[in-house]
Amino acid sequence: MIFLDVETCGFHGPATLIQWATLDGEIQLHDVWCTPIQETLDLIYMIVDDEEGIVGFNLAFDWFHICQLYTMLVQFPDPNERPIDHIDELAILEEQGRFGDCLKPVSALDLMLHARKGPYQGTMNRSDVKVKKVPTALAWEVAKELDARIPLKDVYFARKQDVKKRWQVMDITDDFGDIIPDFKNIVLKFAPSSALKALAADALGYDTETIRMFTDIELPTQCQPTESGYAPFALAHGKPGDWNWSWPDVIRIHMEHWLFNESARKYASDDVKYTRELYHYFGKPALGDNDSILACMVGTVRWRGFAIDVDGILKLKKQAVEALAAMPHNFNSPVVCRTYLEQVMDETERLNLSYQDRPSTRSIILEDIANWTEDTVCPECKGMGENDLGEECSHCSGGLVKSDIPHKAARRAQLILDCRHAKKEIELYDKLLKAGRFHASFKVIGTLSSRMAGADGLNPQGIKHATTVRECFPLADCGLSLCGGDFAGFEVCLADAVYGDPDLHADLVTGKKIHGLFGQYLFPPMTYDEILATKGLPDNEDKYARSKNGVFALLYGGQEYTLSTRVGIPEEIANEAYQRWINKYKVWGKERAKIFDMFCSMRQPSGIGTKVTWAEPSNFIESMFGFKRYFTLENQICKVLFKLAEDPPKHWTRMHLKVTRRDRVQTASGAVRSALFASAFALQAANMRAAANHVIQSSGATITKLLQKNIWDLQPIGISEWLVQPLNIHDEIMCPTKLEMIPEVRKIVDLTVSGLIPKVPLLEIEWGDKLETWASK
């Protein structure tokens, strides 16, 4: 077993130092650039062939650099030479190294990923907690009280300059950007670190004042190379004689830094020391879990990259540039966007252009507005929403008659969205063209549900599904043929397995589309067949697509508000649709209610407006495959907010000050209590949604990872030619494959899916062989 870490020139340049040790052996520092090439190659051979495997912290990063280094050095004709004496030659060979052999260790354990499966999941990025509209007179006292009542670990703020800075008092501005003097927001801004040293300080008890952090020993900014994660080689940035400050221009500085700076060398040695100690702290976990194996796979696959059609990408970029140039305004400016929308909005409609008490034209707002229609006042009830008997009007919804004619603001919102999408597309195409390949990079556990997430400046999961785009991604080259497919109705079959509703299962087995089933309730009185018939119609007329948006919102924990914004229907109709759905599929409704009940810590047994009581919530939710999403931190904060709202300090209640908060005149302490309760309920609601989301998304992540890992098992251990090169995007697995291995890959796919059928009865993958492009699947 080898404990491994590397130091590099920048984030994406070649390794400068390899630190390693056996289970009980002395820590070794191998200086790459001043050592004969053969010695480095021999070390890599030893690491790859170790019979137990490797243990590291963030192996996707380290293994990428081992592969990058090996494939560059192995091409050099004289292995007795030192790399530092042949910088230009090696920089030229580096690019070609992407087409070299595959490196795969015997086994692996990534302790960063292991930590993310337990309570240290809390070190992953998370949203701020806000207490909104607190009277200014009490704002700083409330912040101080929250600091005192909620003891939070420094690791949750490790990326801040001042880790002790927790709850902050923030100004609130009105629609004109002016500060509202009477109220403040109190915000808990997390800046957690899952870095090795931060975890070592918290788990192993090292003094944060004496532990060496990278910022303590790193070279100054002017010594860092020009680089990019999506084009991770020097020739993407420069050429011999003009390297444009990419790594060939600074490698000597980095070599000398890691060779002669004793503090830097101690820092590097500590990396292995802490990794080994964490291995023991976590109870010597077994090597070979799927996530750790995939971390090494992600690193080596990222370095190789995937084939793209450069001419096709150039054509797409030209079209996007032309579309952007044709836009009537500069939609890069939020002020321009807001003004453009307000021109066709009335005073009430303009209230939608805000987010968290600030003016905003963020995408989620524009997506909602893009669904607006030109509704008219109901002539039957004159806009009252009820008849003379007080009964709900059967001709309208809340006094308005819906239409399929887009609102003027809807058209403008969609135009702004199109502009932003075109801008993002151009950025993507520029990145791909710079590299000449698609260097897909992932965080193996990138979200709290364990899903993979894009990394290093290019998000593979953001690439459009459009055929014209995916035709430009042949993906396979160098003698490999593209295979791949995606899971059919993935989220739906997972929901069927998770909730186990026999009525829904019976409908799905007959081939009925869940989007059509739900669409009947979203767009009454339309029938199932009428919903399906709208598929492909323009704009809001496509009720099938809008129903599909509603289904995904439903699957991921959304209720009436989310359904309303995602589908573009009034909240009352969304609520009625949700209630009709869970009344028809009662087991679904009961199982969903169980999840919500697990995290419903604050309850009003006697109804809205009555006393709120506290019930201890669950600390985690578990997927059908056993991956836990922890809510320990959120529950801790929520409970303190509740307790403080229930029983604030007495001197707050004695303050004789009245304020008007959300159209209600309250005492200052009463307004504080309202703000605290609102924050606690918002946090609770977020937990409930995340829990409902988790049982679907985490299960999907486990399945796609399992299939990737099983395909990757076909790649030989050690250093060898490429046989398979898996890539996971959402519910798709694409895999350039050596021709003779295609039947073996197909067999693995079939065995994996059939093995999961007992847990996920409707699981199915539509797999194809010898595909021309990503669009062919």
Predicted regions located by residue number:
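Active-site palm subdomain of RNA-directed nucleic acid polymerases
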Residues: F282-L294, I703-I733
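Function-dense linear segments that define catalytic or interfacial modules
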Residues: S441-G536
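A short acidic-Thr-Gly-centered motif at the start of a beta-strand
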Residues: M1, I44-V48, H465-S481, D713-G718
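Conserved pre-motif C helix in the palm subdomain of viral-like polymerases
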Residues: D270-R276, R689-W712
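A common structural junction motif
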Residues: Y585, D750-V760
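Active-site-proximal helix-loop-helix substrate-binding element of RNase H-like nuclease domains
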Residues: H12-T16, W20, D24-Y279, G283, ...
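Conserved "right-hand" nucleotidyltransferase catalytic core of DNA-directed polymerases
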Residues: E7, K132-A191, L204, R212-H465, ...
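Entry/capping segment at the start of metal-dependent catalytic domains
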Residues: M1-A15
